[in-house]
Amino acid sequence: MQASKALLAALALGITGLAQAADEVVVYSSRIDELIKPVFDAYTSKTGVKVKFITDKEAPLMARIKAEGANTPADLLLTVDAGNLWQAEQMGLLQPFKSATIERNIPSQYRSSTDSWTGLSLRARTIVYSTERVKPEELSTYEALADKQWEGRLCLRTAKKVYNQSLTGTLIETHGAQKTEEILQGWVNNLATDVFADDNAVIQAVDAGQCDVGIVNTYYYGRLHKQNPNLRVKLFWPNQADRGVHVNLSGIGLTRHAPHPEAAKALVEWMTGPDAQALFAGINQEFPANPQVAPSAEVASWGSFKADSIPVEVAGKRQAEAIRLMDRAGWN
């Protein structure tokens, strides 16, 4: 009888331990603390589930998950750009997770076709222009920035960044390799300066008069404009008469060996819902991936636009080809 009681007590302790372990989720994130902590704190306040997170660049995080294998503590990988999420999927780091809630909240073009990841927020990679030297009616499409009109007037970020690789991937999907290479060559020919390390530098160069136009992610513009409302730079939405603006995302995927898959899935479902979408997108100065949720007042002030309907995972599928074409065009 005493032995039975001892066994029952041990089992109870074991079950309690499992329940406590399931009351936390571990996220590896390439987004910095200040952009994610308020969201995870809100989830903990609502559910009692603790969200632990580690931040780093996407490549080291993916290498870490791969090295940890079945012993990884990571339940979720949160990163920027569909190209990175697609890469993680190809490396075997993620597993599919079906969810009617996520399917209802997030359009299919912003989710993996294998259900391994979903978008959480959207950013447009669009044109910025000098309000002093360019009239908006002079602008039209990404492709038109290759025209002679813009010779010595264009600024770009390095081709090494996945954001430009993804934009190029969608150009390949739209135009094919030959036409895309011609466009890229035109951009390179029109450069006013060497390429920059980041989008902030592109915007600042346009403001300073080093160049007249550039291509950047919208949230960089949002951050700089917040710091300096007198910025002499504005956004322009290209390709409104055809396919629309190139849109990419921040997204999240369930790791292959997630210790708490159900708890992780519940967190992702909540993050695609109205409250979390407004909070996450607002902090990041991005657009909610859930179309039922309005963007922040600041983001809404940039105006509405037609977005490219190409599934964002195309950016990953075309990534290797995009890098080859960028290299051949001399975009370094």
Swiss-Prot record:
Pfam families: SBP_bac_8 (PF13416)
InterPro entries, sorted: Ferric-bd, SBP
Family affiliation: Belongs to the bacterial solute-binding protein 1 family.
Upper taxonomic lineage: Bacteria, Pseudomonadati, Pseudomonadota, Gammaproteobacteria, Pseudomonadales
SUPFAM superfamilies: Periplasmic binding protein-like II
Keyword annotations from UniProtKB, A to Z: Signal
Protein name in UniProt: Probable binding protein component of ABC iron transporter PA5217
Signal peptide bounds: 1-21
Source organism of the structure: Pseudomonas aeruginosa (strain ATCC 15692 / DSM 22644 / CIP 104116 / JCM 14847 / LMG 12228 / 1C / PRS 101 / PAO1)
